[in-house]
């Protein structure tokens, strides 16, 4: 089915989040005191497993003393793209210069890892959004929609296809992008046959689909698109001026965004 191994967290989630975010801060060269917001995202069912002082503990550990925490959820594995878009909107405030975006997902009971559509692994991903950055990626557009029948597990091929195409066409139009202009698509790590099926539904050619971390990490919820993007960036590299599509599939939801390398 395309996945050989998965990663499992053996320590409290805060330790993994702190380590990942610390690396993003160090890699950006931004002082922790200069970060204005940190936007977290995870799947709905993980919210009840977080410590009541989760955000406070992360802020204290990393020295984010001027940073406002925000949590985005309720869109399952599509929540991280909602968080990315929310973070983009924060820059409408001229006083905001640095925003951290963090996605994490984990499975509490191992028996829940194997699902009909994916094998679940644990992961944390994060990135720093910087006003006026001369290098990196820029979010050009974003789209999300919900299929209520899918949320109830009663959707069908036609309703899923309609959900994907309506959302994706809107995001492409907003960024004045044709699908043929997309260099690569970073998508959700469902079982490989399902990932290929989803790519076909959304018009993505097989050689333009990147779900490479499926093999070693399985499906890590909200982290998949960023894990695949990072893998591609490390192994192949992003081309300045090229556009990249990111996708997030979830029961009843589909979200996507257009990124441009600068």
Predicted regions and their residues:
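Short, high-confidence coil segments that cap the C-terminus of an alpha-helix
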Residues: 35, 96-97, 182, 241
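Condensing-enzyme catalytic core mediating Claisen C-C bond formation in acyl metabolism
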Residues: 1-13, 111-170, 249, 258-262
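Membrane helical hairpin/interfacial module
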Residues: 32-46, 58
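A short glycine/serine-rich beta->alpha loop
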Residues: 3-9, 43-44, 69-73, 112-114, ...
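Conserved active-site "lid/cap" helical segment
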Residues: 1-37, 148-183, 193-206, 228-232, ...
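Short beta-strand segments
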Residues: 41, 99-105, 129, 246-249
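Phosphate-binding/catalytic loop of phosphoryl-transfer enzymes
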Residues: 92-117, 124, 252-254
């Amino acid at each position: 089915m395309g996945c050989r191994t998965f990663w499992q967290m053996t320590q409290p989630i805060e330790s993994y989040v702190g380590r990942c975010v610390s690396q993003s801060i160090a890699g950006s060269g931004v002082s922790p005191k200069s970060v204005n917001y940190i936007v977290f995202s995870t799947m709905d069912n993980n919210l009840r497993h977080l410590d009541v002082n989760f955000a406070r503990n992360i802020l204290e550990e990393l020295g984010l003393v001027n940073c406002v925490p925000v949590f985005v959820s309720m869109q399952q594995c599509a929540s991280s793209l909602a968080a990315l878009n929310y973070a983009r909107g924060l820059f409408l405030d001229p006083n905001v210069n640095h925003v951290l975006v963090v996605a994490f997902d984990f499975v509490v009971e191992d028996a829940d890892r194997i699902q009909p559509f994916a094998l679940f692994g644990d992961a944390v991903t994060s990135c720093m959004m910087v006003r006026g950055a001369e290098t990196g990626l820029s979010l050009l557009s974003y789209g999300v929609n919900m299929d209520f029948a899918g949320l109830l597990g009663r959707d069908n091929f036609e309703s899923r296809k309609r959900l994907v195409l309506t959302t994706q066409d809107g995001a492409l139009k907003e960024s004045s992008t044709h699908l043929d202009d997309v260099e690569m698509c970073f998508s959700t790590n469902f079982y490989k046959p399902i990932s290929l099926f989803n790519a076909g539904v959304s018009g993505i050619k097989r050689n333009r689909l990147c779900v490479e971390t499926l093999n070693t990490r399985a499906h890590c919820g909200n982290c998949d698109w960023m894990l695949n993007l990072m893998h591609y960036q490390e192994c192949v590299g992003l081309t300045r001026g090229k556009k990249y599509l990111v996708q997030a599939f979830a029961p009843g939801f589909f979200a996507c965004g257009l990124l441009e390398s600068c």
